[in-house]
């Protein structure tokens, strides 16, 4: 009886595919495309040395203590990037694989990229379904830091107030991120004479719009901040494995979704491991725990996006 063996399926997968998936995830995920990537992790936990105390300089008074110089110190705290595993399983009918008239990867690859990018953004920005040893999502962290500005309906003024929050923490805003509905608001942003405000500082800042369905418009209209202060590291690049004898269960209730051998199916399991953190070191403008490199525009009770 003719069957599709694992080696037969492996021949459909080129080595470069894993790299293409990884590059696609980085491109499609706003977190991975906007945050700063650190060198790959060598274990499941990476320690970050974070500046916690700044040195203090003194003028020397020759009339006091024979001009003796004062001493000072610096201090470092530590934070950790914890690697979490992200995986997806794509079941495929063997008959589909036998259809030479279609490009299997052209159908499967975009869905894998989409699933990974969406899960990463949900966890990193909003803390939705995040691993237990990951920090809070970016928006919940902004709320905890008291770095929210209430929306007034005057977008230009609102963005200015959000940027001021970041600047008072000692950081410079290098990007603004929001949902796709924010595009229309930017197009309507004009001065008192009705002219577009594209030549101002706010108009020149990089704008990004999340279009993967993750953005929660009821929690935040937009985020502004220094996105280089959010960092991530990869523990394991995208890897794949072909399954042909497995049983796939529903994680929510344990019910069997597919019995690959019985259902004449194979499944592609794709895995990557990564972690992230916001070091938030002290700086000359703000040495207190109130500082945070991001701020959010809190939507009105009836969001307009």
What name fits each language-model region?
Residues 16-31, 104-108, 112-116, 120, ...:
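Short, Φ-rich (hydrophobic/aromatic) sequence segments
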Residues 2-88:
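Assembly/oligomerization interface modules of large self-assembling protein complexes
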Residues 1-39, 259-305:
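Protruding loop/beta-arch "assembly-hinge" segments enriched in small, turn-prone residues
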Residues 59-61, 102, 187-191, 218-222, ...:
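Short conserved micro-motifs at the rims of enzyme active sites and ligand-binding pockets
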Residues 77-80, 87-168, 296-305:
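Alpha-helical scaffold segments that mediate packing/assembly in large oligomeric complexes
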Residues 42, 144-266, 272, 301-305:
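Extended oligomerization regions of viral-like shell subunits
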């Amino acid at each position: 009886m003719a069957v599709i063996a694992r080696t037969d399926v492996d021949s459909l997968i080129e080595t470069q595919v894993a790299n293409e998936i990884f590059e696609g995830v980085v491109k499609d995920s706003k977190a991975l495309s906007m945050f700063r990537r650190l060198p790959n992790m060598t274990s499941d936990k990476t320690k970050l040395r974070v500046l916690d105390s700044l040195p203090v300089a003194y003028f020397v008074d020759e009339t006091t203590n024979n001009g003796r110089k004062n001493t000072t110190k610096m201090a470092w705290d530590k934070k950790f990037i914890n690697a979490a595993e992200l995986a997806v399983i794509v079941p495929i009918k063997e008959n589909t694989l036998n259809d030479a008239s279609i490009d299997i990867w052209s159908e499967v690859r975009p869905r894998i990229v989409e699933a990974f990018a969406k899960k990463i953004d949900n966890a990193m920005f909003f803390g939705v379904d995040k691993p237990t040893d990951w920090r809070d999502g970016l928006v919940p962290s902004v709320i905890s830091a008291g770095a929210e500005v209430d929306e007034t309906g005057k977008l230009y003024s609102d963005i200015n107030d959000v940027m001021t929050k970041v600047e008072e923490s000692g950081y410079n805003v290098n990007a603004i991120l929001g949902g796709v509905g924010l595009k229309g608001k930017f197009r309507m942003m004009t001065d008192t004479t009705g002219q577009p405000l594209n030549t101002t500082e706010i108009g020149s800042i990089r704008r990004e719009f999340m279009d993967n369905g993750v953005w929660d418009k009821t929690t935040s209209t937009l985020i502004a901040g220094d996105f280089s202060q959010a960092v991530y590291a990869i523990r394991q690049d995208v890897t794949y494995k072909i399954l042909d004898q497995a049983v796939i269960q529903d994680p929510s209730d344990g019910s069997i979704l597919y019995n690959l051998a019985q259902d004449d199916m194979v499944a592609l399991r794709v895995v990557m491991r990564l972690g992230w953190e916001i070091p938030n070191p002290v700086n000359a403008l703000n040495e207190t725990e109130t500082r945070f490199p991001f701020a959010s525009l809190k939507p009105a009770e009836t969001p307009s996006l």
